[in-house]
Swiss-Prot record:
SMART domains: TFIIE. It comes from Pyrobaculum islandicum (strain DSM 4184 / JCM 9189 / GEO3). Belongs to the TFE family. Transcription factor that plays a role in the activation of archaeal genes transcribed by RNA polymerase. Facilitates transcription initiation by enhancing TATA-box recognition by TATA-box-binding protein (Tbp), and transcription factor B (Tfb) and RNA polymerase recruitment. Not absolutely required for transcription in vitro, but particularly important in cases where Tbp or Tfb function is not optimal. It dynamically alters the nucleic acid-binding properties of RNA polymerases by stabilizing the initiation complex and destabilizing elongation complexes. This is Transcription factor E. The lineage of its organism: Archaea, Thermoproteota, Thermoprotei, Thermoproteales, Thermoproteaceae. PROSITE patterns: HTH_TFE_IIE (PS51344).
Length: 170
């Protein structure tokens, strides 16, 4: 389960910041938080990993918004607000559960759209068109001019249903 969580963190951050390097950095941040089993400030995380505090904060705040790390807020003796970050098994479980829920919703939506209408595909450029779009284009692909072909959706629907059932087990 931990590997799946680390993969989700890495890919999510890499996608958000359009940087595979940031994804790998986020993976290191959450690995550190999980292995140390203690609440750490962003400054301490930055020191442990030898990276800038700004990068650390940016990654941690994104992960917090995605519910992939836990955060605790406390006021210091000199009335400053200090945030500490942590990752535990419950955070990992919830992150995977939330990601599975989003995936199920997308798959369900795709299955619904495939069952509700007929689709045509261009055999050359593989663009997919609804029945209405195919009629509007006269049965010809507007991108490359090739004749559109009807797609039998049952095989795709069956595959997506199996994937949905697998995700539902999580």
């Amino acid at each position: 389960m931990k590997e799946a969580y680390l993969y989700i963190v890495e890919k999510s951050v890499a996608w958000e910041f359009d940087s595979p390097e940031y994804g790998r950095l986020a993976r290191k941040v959450v690995e550190l938080l999980y292995e140390r089993k203690e609440d750490l400030s962003d400054d301490r995380v930055a020191i442990f990993l030898n990276i800038s505090t700004a990068e650390t904060r940016r990654i941690l705040q994104y992960l917090m918004k995605q519910n992939m790390v836990g955060v605790k807020k406390r006021t210091t003796e000199d009335y400053r607000i200090e945030y500490t970050w942590y990752v535990d098994d419950e955070i990992i479980r919830q992150a995977i559960k939330n990601r599975a829920k989003v995936a199920k919703e997308k798959i369900s939506s795709l299955i619904r759209s495939l069952t509700e209408g007929a689709y045509y595909i261009c055999p050359t450029c593989h663009m997919r068109y609804t029945l209405d779009e195919a009629i509007n284009y006269g049965g010809v692909c507007p991108v490359c001019g090739t004749q559109l072909e009807y797609v039998e959706n049952t095989e795709e629907i069956n595959k997506l249903t199996k994937v949905y059932e697998e995700v539902d087990k999580i």
